[in-house]
């Protein structure tokens, strides 16, 4: 996703919260993006760890959308580093919510 697509998604998309994630989405092309804010995690090592965990959780759970395509932007809102199981559970819940719509 490029900056223009992200801004359009933030303006026109819907939002779902499942701690520690805030997910903006809309039906569309099937693009995926995510962000871990620098203001919450100063060290790049921590941000990269969380980005790897979110990316892997999405990759493993993407099949829950049942072939429907959404533009999805995941924003990590937690203040602490959560373990992979917590992130995976949150991503699975979000994708189940989207599939049910």
Roles of regions detected by a PLM:
Residues 1-101:
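Positively charged, solvent-exposed patches that mediate nucleic-acid binding
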